[in-house]
A protein has these predicted regions:
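Accessory beta-strand-rich segments of carbohydrate-active enzymes
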Residues: 4, 11-17, 59, 63, ...
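Substrate-binding clefts and catalytic carboxylate motifs of secreted carbohydrate-active enzymes
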Residues: 11-20, 86, 223, 234-237, ...
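Intrinsically disordered, low-complexity Pro/Gly/Ser/Thr-rich segments with frequent PxxP/GP/PP motifs
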Residues: 305-325, 742-777, 841-866
Length: 891
C-alpha cells in the first residue's frame, strides 16, 4: 500500500455560479492569464450602479476579485488567474490570507462576506503518480470532508459528485490516472444555491439570523446559516485529510472492541473487524493478527485465518482480558486506555491498521420506572451511577474547517479542569475530527452525541435525501464506535419537541417529517455498528410529550417563563430551582459577557461603549440585555449605575451564580443525574451562554461552575427548622469526614455549632438535617470539612442584605515553580473577591470567591510572574433592603 497526501498548496479561483463543471477548461485557461481589469457581469451595466458604486468599481480592482460589499455585497471575478490556498482549509481563510477579505469576526465584517456563498470555487492541484501506484488493484481518492456541493474532475474527466459534508468521499479513480503529472480539480459551492428551487417542509423557531427553512436540504453544519446566537458565515472548502491511497490485498477498514461484561478484575470483550479485499473476482486466505497493549506491554494477542472474498468481510472474537484496567469518566477513576493494533497478510502482502486507543468499560442508560410513575434517566459506567456534569459543545469556529488540533485539546482540557464528565454534541453543529474524540477519551469526558439535525423538519419524503442520511449514519456510527467516551447517540436536537410543542395548526406539518431518519435509519445504524451504545430518537425525549420533566432528559428552557409545576420565574425566584422535577437537564442557560480583552479584540480599535454598533452586533442586542440587566438589578446591583467595565464584571458574575444555582439544585436531588449547560464553548466572539469564549478565554462564570461541579462537594440549604446538608463524593476513595456546621453572622460571630462525622463511601451522596437558628437577615448557615470548599446557605439574592464593608487584602505571595500562590483574607463576609493581572486571560485554580470572616484562602495563579491585584465586586443593597432596619447585630 502507498499513500500520497494532497494536503498543502493548491490554487483557488472564484467564478460565477453558472460556470459549471462542464466549463472547467475555460476556467483552467485563466491559470496563467495576464492581469486584466475586472468586468461587470453581463446582467449589470455600469450605469445600473450608484455613483458611489461606480467610483468604487473604477478604481484599480483587486487582481483576483472586484468586491462590492458596501451596498450590493456582490463579488465579480476578474480574468486574472488563481490565488494560493492551503488545503485542508476554507475558502474564506484563503481570501483572508490573500488580503481579499478581512477577518469576519472583527467589527461587523460578517456582513461584508455574504457574497462568498454566491460564487463557485475552483480548487486545482497537480500531483505525480508512479507506475507502482497504478499496478495496485485500487487507487482511491479519499477526502474526509467536502463542504459542500462538489464536482470532482480528474485529468479533465468528471470523476464524481458529492453533496454531504458529514460523510467522507472515497472513490476509485485509477481509470482516470496515468504515470507522471496528473491534475485534480474540485469545483465547490457552499450549497446555498440549492435552496431556492426546493420545496421546504421546515419552520425554524426563534432565530434572529437563520434561514427559516431550506437549510434542511444541505447536509452540512446547520449553524453556518446563522442561529439565534451566531451570525451566518458562509463556509466552503476541503476539511481534514485528503489523500490518494493505492493498495492490493486486504486491509482492516473498520474495527471496535466491545466490553460485554465485567467479572471481578476480568473483562469479557469482543473484537469486531470489517476487512476489505481488493480483488473482487477471487478469494484469498488472510492471516489476521491483533493485539491489545497497555503501557507498552502486550496483554492479549489474537490470530485468525480467514478465507476472504472480494469486497467486505467480517470477523469477530470474544475473549477474557485478565486484570483489566478500566476506563472511568473524569473524577470517577483513571482513564486507562489500551492500544489496539491489527494487521492482515494476504499473498505475502502486509497491511497494518492505524492503531486505536480503546477503553475497557461497560455503559448503560437506566430508564427504570419509579414508584410514583416517573422514570429514571441516569448513566452507569462499570456499574457505578454517574452524575453527568458539563455543557453543550458547539463548533469551535464558524469557519470550522480552520480549527487547529491544539484548540480541541485546550477546550477538552478546560472542561476536565471544570470537573466536567460530559459534553452534549449539539445537532446543529458537526461531527468533529478524530482528535476531539481522542481527547475526550483521554480526559474522561462522556459524549451525548446528537446526529447533526436541529430545530427543523427534514425532507424524508425525498429519496436522495434519505440516501445521504443513511450513508451519513452508517459512516459516523462506524467511525466513532471504538471510542470509550461515546455514551449515547441522540437522533437530533429538539425536533420531536418542536413537533409536539412548538407549532400549532395550521403551521404544524401534516406529519412528523424526519421520522424515517430519526426513528428508523439512525437506530438501525447504531445497532449495527455500536450496539452497546444507547440510542434516543431526539433530545429531549421520553414521555407523552418529548420534553416531560419526569421522564427523560429535558431542555429546561420552559423555566424561563412561569412554569406550570414549579410556579416560578427564571432568575427571579432562585429557590424554586430546587423544585425543578427534571432528572437530567441537557440544556439550560443564561447569558454572560466576555472578558474585556475579548471585547476589545473584536472592537478592533473602536471605542468600548454601550451604543457601539459593533458591540451590539456581537450579541449585545436589546432582548439579551433585558435579561442580563434584569438579573443584575434583582441580585447584585442597580445595572443603570454600571459603566461598560462594571457591566462586564457583574454580567459575568450573574451568569456564574445562575449556572451554579441549577447545578447544585440538580446535584442534591436523589433522582438528579445530569446537568449540562447551554453552551460550553462558542463559534464566534459574542455575549452569550458560554463559560469559555471564542478566543478560548475563561469567562468569569467558569469559576462558579467549576466550584459547583467539584468532585467532593458540600451543599447547604435553609429549610424548615434549620438546614439540610448534602455531602457528595464522586471519587473512588472512601474516607471519614468531620462536617462542621452552624450559623455565622457577616462579621464572624457563630451559633448552633455542631460536628457530624460521616463515613463517606466512594461514588456516593448523603444528606442530613441540622437544627440551627434562623435569623438569615444578618448571617447564614454554613458547612465545612477538610478537602471541601465551605458551603453557605446564601442564594444569589445579594441585594437583600446589607454586607459590612470588606477589608479584603493580600496577606502573602509565594512563588511555586511558574505559578504564584496568593493568600487573601478579610475580617468580614466578602462575596466575589477576585485577583486580576494586566492580562485577563491568566488562569487561576479558583477566582471570584467568597471570603469567610478571618479565614485565609490561597489561590494559585498559573504561569504568572506579575503580582496580581485583589478586587471585590461588592453587591449593592436594594432600596427596600436599605429601608429595613437590619443594622443591629443579631447578637
Amino acid at each position: 500500500m502507498s499513500k500520497l497526501s494532497l494536503a498543502g498548496a493548491w490554487k483557488l479561483r472564484g467564478e460565477f455560479m453558472d460556470v459549471t463543471a462542464e466549463r472547467y477548461n475555460e476556467v483552467l485557461r485563466k491559470m496563467d492569464a495576464a492581469p486584466v481589469r475586472a468586468t461587470l457581469p453581463a446582467f449589470l451595466k455600469l450605469e445600473d450602479l450608484s455613483e458611489e458604486e461606480q467610483a468604487e468599481f473604477l478604481k484599480d480592482p483587486n487582481p483576483h476579485f472586484h468586491v462590492m460589499t458596501d451596498k450590493s455585497n456582490h463579488a465579480f471575478p476578474s480574468k486574472y488567474g488563481f490565488i494560493p490556498m492551503t488545503v485542508p482549509g476554507d475558502v474564506t481563510t484563503a481570501l483572508i490570507e490573500n488580503g481579499i477579505v478581512e477577518e469576519p469576526f472583527l467589527k461587523e465584517n460578517t456582513k461584508k462576506n455574504q457574497w462568498i456563498k454566491d460564487l463557485s470555487w475552483w480548487l486545482v492541484r497537480d500531483f505525480d503518480v508512479t507506475e507502482e501506484m497504478l499496478n495496485e488493484d485500487i487507487v482511491r481518492l479519499n477526502i474526509e470532508m467536502l463542504d459542500f456541493n462538489a464536482d470532482i474532475i480528474v485529468n479533465g474527466m468528471p470523476a464524481a459528485h458529492h453533496e454531504n459534508a458529514f460523510c467522507a468521499f472515497s472513490e476509485d479513480i485509477k481509470r482516470f490516472l496515468h504515470v507522471g503529472k496528473n491534475q485534480l480539480v474540485i469545483r465547490l459551492t457552499s450549497g446555498m444555491e440549492l435552496h431556492y428551487p426546493r420545496d421546504a417542509v421546515s419552520f425554524y423557531c426563534a432565530s434572529e439570523n437563520a434561514i427559516c427553512d431550506q437549510r434542511v436540504y444541505t447536509r452540512k453544519p446547520q449553524f453556518t446559516y446563522g442561529w439565534d446566537w451566531c451570525q451566518p458565515v458562509p463556509t466552503c472548502g476541503i476539511g481534514r485529510s485528503i489523500e490518494i491511497e493505492a493498495f492490493s490485498g486486504a486491509q482492516v477498514i473498520a474495527s471496535r472492541v466491545d466490553t460485554l461484561k465485567l467479572d471481578g478484575d476480568d473483562a469479557e470483550v469482543e473484537f469486531h473487524f470489517e476487512i476489505e479485499k481488493s480483488d473482487m473476482v477471487s478469494s484469498a486466505e488472510c492471516e489476521l493478527t491483533y493485539t491489545l497493549e497497555f503501557e507498552g506491554k502486550t496483554v492479549y494477542t489474537g490470530k485468525k485465518t480467514l478465507m476472504l472474498v472480494g469486497g467486505v468481510n467480517f470477523a469477530e472474537e470474544r475473549v477474557t482480558i485478565k486484570n483489566a484496567k478500566l476506563w472511568w469518566p473524569n473524577g470517577y477513576g483513571a482513564q486507562n486506555l489500551y492500544t489496539f493494533k491489527a494487521c492482515c497478510v494476504t499473498k505475502g502482502i502486509l497491511h497494518e491498521m492505524q492503531p486505536k486507543k480503546i477503553g475497557i468499560r461497560t455503559l448503560e442508560l437506566d430508564t427504570s420506572k419509579l414508584e410514583d410513575g416517573s422514570r429514571n434517566f441516569f448513566f452507569k459506567v462499570n456499574g457505578v451511577r454517574i452524575f453527568c456534569k458539563g455543557g453543550n459543545w458547539v463548533p469551535t469556529d464558524s469557519l470550522y474547517l480552520r480549527t487547529p488540533k491544539e484548540s480541541y485539546e485546550t477546550l477538552v482540557r478546560e472542561g476536565a479542569a471544570a470537573h466536567f464528565t460530559m459534553f452534549r454534541m449539539w445537532g446543529g453543529g458537526t461531527y468533529e475530527p478524530d482528535c476531539f474524540y481522542e481527547y475526550c477519551s483521554e480526559y474522561g469526558i462522556l459524549l451525548m452525541h446528537d446526529f447533526m439535525y436541529a430545530c427543523a423538519f427534514y425532507p424524508d419524503h425525498k429519496n436522495d435525501f434519505l440516501f445521504e442520511a443513511e450513508r451519513e449514519a452508517e459512516y459516523q456510527t462506524k467511525r466513532l464506535a471504538h471510542y470509550p467516551c461515546m455514551a449515547i447517540w441522540t437522533g437530533n436536537n429538539e425536533i420531536a419537541e418542536s413537533y409536539t410543542d412548538w407549532f400549532p395548526a395550521p403551521i404544524k406539518p401534516e406529519r412528523f417529517y424526519g421520522e424515517k431518519i430519526f426513528n428508523y435509519i439512525q437506530p438501525r445504524a447504531v445497532h449495527r455498528n455500536s450496539p452497546l451504545v444507547p440510542y434516543m430518537p431526539s433530545s429531549p425525549y421520553f414521555g407523552d410529550r418529548a420534553n416531560e420533566s419526569e421522564q427523560g432528559g429535558v431542555h429546561a428552557w420552559s423555566f424561563f417563563g412561569r412554569h406550570p409545576k414549579t410556579k416560578f420565574k427564571f432568575v427571579y425566584e432562585l429557590e424554586a430551582f430546587d423544585r425543578i422535577p427534571a432528572r437530567f437537564s441537557s440544556e439550560y442557560g443564561f447569558f454572560g459577557a466576555q472578558m474585556e480583552s475579548t471585547v476589545r479584540r473584536y472592537l478592533d480599535g473602536t471605542e468600548m461603549r454601550f451604543d457601539n454598533p459593533i458591540w451590539k452586533h456581537h450579541g449585545e442586542f436589546d432582548r439579551k440585555r433585558s435579561n442580563i440587566d434584569g438579573a443584575i438589578d434583582r441580585h447584585l446591583t442597580e445595572f443603570k449605575t454600571l459603566d461598560e467595565h462594571g457591566y462586564l464584571l457583574y454580567s459575568g458574575i450573574m451568569q456564574g451564580l445562575l449556572y451554579a444555582e441549577l447545578a447544585e439544585a440538580m446535584r442534591r436531588k436523589p433522582y438528579g443525574a445530569g446537568d449540562l449547560i447551554w453552551m460550553y464553548n462558542d463559534c464566534w466572539p459574542e455575549t452569550g451562554w458560554t463559560i469559555i469564549d471564542y478566543y478560548l478565554t475563561r469567562k468569569i462564570s467558569f469559576y462558579f461552575l467549576k466550584r459547583a461541579f467539584a468532585t467532593k462537594k458540600l451543599i447547604i440549604r435553609a429549610c424548615e427548622g434549620g438546614a439540610e446538608v448534602t455531602v457528595i463524593n464522586e471519587t473512588p476513595e472512601a474516607y471519614t469526614a468531620d462536617i462542621h456546621c452552624g450559623y455565622m453572622t457577616f462579621t464572624g460571630e457563630t451559633d448552633s455549632l455542631c460536628t457530624k462525622t460521616l463515613k463517606v463511601a466512594p461514588h456516593s451522596m448523603q444528606q442530613f438535617h441540622i437544627s440551627v437558628c434562623n435569623d438569615l437577615k444578618h448571617g447564614f448557615f454554613f458547612a465545612s470539612a477538610e478537602g471541601f470548599d465551605t458551603a453557605d446557605s446564601l442564594r444569589a439574592y445579594y441585594r437583600d442584605y446589607v454586607f459590612p464593608e470588606s477589608d479584603a487584602k493580600i496577606e502573602k505571595v509565594e512563588q511555586d515553580g511558574n505559578d504564584l500562590l496568593v493568600t487573601i483574607r478579610a475580617s468580614v463576609y466578602t462575596p466575589f473577591a477576585y485577583l486580576m493581572t494586566s492580562d485577563d486571560r491568566v488562569h487561576y485554580d479558583d477566582n471570584y470567591v467568597t471570603l469567610y470572616p478571618n479565614e485565609p484562602k490561597t489561590l494559585r495563579v498559573e504561569n504568572c510572574t506579575e503580582t496580581p491585584v485583589l478586587h471585590v465586586a461588592a453587591p449593592a443593597p436594594s432600596e427596600e433592603t436599605k429601608k429595613a432596619s437590619y443594622t443591629d447585630s443579631w447578637f
